[in-house]
Amino acid sequence: MFEQHKLSLQNLSCQRGERVLFRALTCDFNSGDFVQIEGHNGIGKTSLLRILAGLVRPLEGEVRWDSEAISKQREQYHQNLLYLGHLSGVKPELTAWENLQFYQRISQAEQNTDMLWDLLEKVGLLGREDLPAAQLSAGQQKRIALGRLWLSQAPLWILDEPFTAIDKKGVEILTALFDEHAQRGGIVLLTSHQEVPSSHLQKLNLAAYKAE
């Protein structure tokens, strides 16, 4: 179980170019929350996740982790965060096995090869473990990146379209993992164009905060 945490969004507004996407977004995400960020294309879902991950600053407002602005505790905050964006982030020159082994080494997960074999099976890459990532499809590279979820000890997961290029069985496996993470006291925030098969899922629709 994780310690109790809270991610607070305080009066957030977001601008892209000359256009304000949303404004006055205030809400809290608490330990145990599994939330899908919704809204039409272009409303700022990815921009919001990047703000929450500390990659960009909001036009107005601030994000707080356990009551302190993330801008004042960047190192500590990022130790508590796993962010997976649109780009896979895998090292193309390394094999699938070597990429997962690298993730294992930089995480606080148990270091053993049995876990890696199990992980390769979970992400559907058994038989392709010795291929350089550069020779794999975009979907297979995405699966390597998703392997980090099973190795992560971070309580806060921020995931931009994690189901892209994933089949139905893979979506079910990932959703079960997200449910489990939330039940352990973690926080899962994601975007998805697909239906998320979870009875625990909450939804936040950015249309309610669309700038006039």
Curated annotation (Swiss-Prot):
Q: Any idea which UniProt keywords this protein has?
A: ATP-binding, Cell inner membrane, Cell membrane, Cytochrome c-type biogenesis, Membrane, Nucleotide-binding, Translocase, Transport
Which terms does the record give in the GO molecular function aspect? ABC-type heme transporter activity; ATP binding; ATP hydrolysis activity
UniProt domain ABC transporter: residue ranges: 7-209
Listed GO biological process terms: cytochrome complex assembly
Q: What is its EC number?
A: 7.6.2.5
Which residues are involved in binding ATP?
A: G39, H40, N41, G42, I43, G44, K45, T46
Subcellular location as annotated:
Cell inner membrane
Reaction(s) catalysed by this chain's protein? heme b(in) + ATP + H2O = heme b(out) + ADP + phosphate + H(+)
Q: How does it sit in the membrane?
A: Peripheral membrane protein
SMART domains given for it?
Answer: AAA
Which Gene Ontology terms of cellular component type are present? Answer: plasma membrane
| Broad enzyme group | translocase
Q: Which family does it belong to?
A: Belongs to the ABC transporter superfamily. CcmA exporter (TC 3.A.1.107) family.
Annotated function: Part of the ABC transporter complex CcmAB involved in the biogenesis of c-type cytochromes; once thought to export heme, this seems not to be the case, but its exact role is uncertain. Responsible for energy coupling to the transport system.
Q: How does it assemble?
A: The complex is composed of two ATP-binding proteins (CcmA) and two transmembrane proteins (CcmB).
Put simply, this protein is called Cytochrome c biogenesis ATP-binding export protein CcmA
Q: What is the lineage of its organism?
A: Bacteria, Pseudomonadati, Pseudomonadota, Gammaproteobacteria, Pasteurellales
Q: Which gene encodes it?
A: ccmA
